[in-house]
């Protein structure tokens, strides 16, 4: 369907969803995209934990992974991240099906799929929990992540939920 075949109201509605309501300098969905890719790039380069902590809400934080208790503080996340680095040699995140929706003037909801690839250390005491196949140290997990991101002086993740890759997006 071309834009000429849309009614004027439908055409303008489609275009206005991107209008910067809070000025040209306001954070928009492309800023959230950039942040999301930067987040995963830092994982792939084994960045220091301080990068993540500066982008995670500490008081009301909730980071949830399948089969684990939620991480609710910076200390919880730092412990989880230290374990990730201790158990793996490398990892890579292939992000797809990214959807971003503004849910409040200073809040976004992002949902996307991640094909997470990596290699667990052969001497890991958690080998079975990381492996995708019992005959390989390489792993591949397809996951859905859904983030609630707050806008302030920087983007901050308040809630991060990881589910199986077959879970539907909450953004319609």
Segment roles from a protein language model:
Residues 1-16, 107-109, 130-172:
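Short beta-strand edge/turn micro-motifs at domain boundaries
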Residues 72, 119, 165-169:
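Short catalytic/ligand-binding loop motif for oxyanion handling, primarily in non-cytosolic enzymes
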Residues 104-126, 141:
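A short hydrophobic beta-strand element
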Residues 27-35, 87-90, 95-97, 152, ...:
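A broad structural signal for short, well-ordered beta-strand segments within beta-sheet-rich domains
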Residues 49-104, 112:
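A solvent-exposed, acidic/Ser-Thr-rich amphipathic alpha-helical stretch
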Residues 1-54, 62-64:
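Short, low-complexity N-terminal intrinsically disordered segments enriched in polar/charged residues
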Residues 56, 114-118, 164:
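Short beta-strand segments enriched in hydrophobic/aromatic residues
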Residues 79-82, 125-131:
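Short Pro/Gly-enriched beta-strand edge/turn motifs at strand-loop
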